[in-house]
Amino acid sequence: MLRLEWVRRLQTITQAGLTYTRDAYDRQRYEQLQELAAEIAESFAPVTSTASQLGATGSQLGATSESWLDLIRAEKGYATPKVDVRGVVERDGKLLFMREAHDGLWSLPGGWADIGESPSQIAEREVLEETGFVVKASKLLAVYDKARHAHPPEFWYCYKMFVRCELHGGAPARSIETLDTSFFGVNELPPLSQPRVTEAQVRRMFEHLAHPDLPTDFD
């Protein structure tokens, strides 16, 4: 979506400009550009990732220029991609999925990377919090540029990491984010939460499980 790309580029430029400028007039101009970006966003209300972990529409936000402006101005410092980490947990040839409370659809457990945690720690924690299973991260299977895959468009530019995790214990559990948990085989996939994971990505994870010597995917 071209207009979403305009908004994203304006946000990146203004965020960097406000970080490094020491000129009061330049700061004012960058803030005006942020307001313009918010007005552009309001005009088409794209899919974004603000109201929940990775999926809310502009209309669900109210899609006003004020709400978009708050979103655009929330990030500080030099703009870099966000990171989403997913745990890939296998049992008897099936993968562990959790049913998202936000949209009622299914995803591999995971979420935004937190500062102070390594990718393996994030994957292990997210799996435990969202499904109740205790796991140990063992291999980075993939790092994907989300914009290059068949996800719905969203405001944040994001990299997705898929981490193989070995099952060590625990039991199925629900959480604020989780309606249900279950294991599914490659030929019995549930309806997927597309902002979080695509069918092609899930099928690729099954290929990694079948061929553990495959190198890490990237891009």
PLM-predicted stretches and their roles:
Residues 1-25, 38:
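Long amphipathic alpha-helical segments
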Residues 6, 29, 197-201:
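Short, hydrophobic-biased amphipathic alpha-helical segments
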Residues 24-28, 154:
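Short, solvent-exposed positions on alpha-helices
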Residues 31-53, 58-86:
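Acidic, metal-coordinating catalytic segment for phosphate/diphosphate chemistry
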Residues 50, 69-107, 135, 139:
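N-terminal strand-loop-strand
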Residues 109-111:
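Extended, positively charged loop/linker patches that create polyanion-binding surfaces
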Residues 113-137, 145-205, 210, 214-219:
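Unchanged
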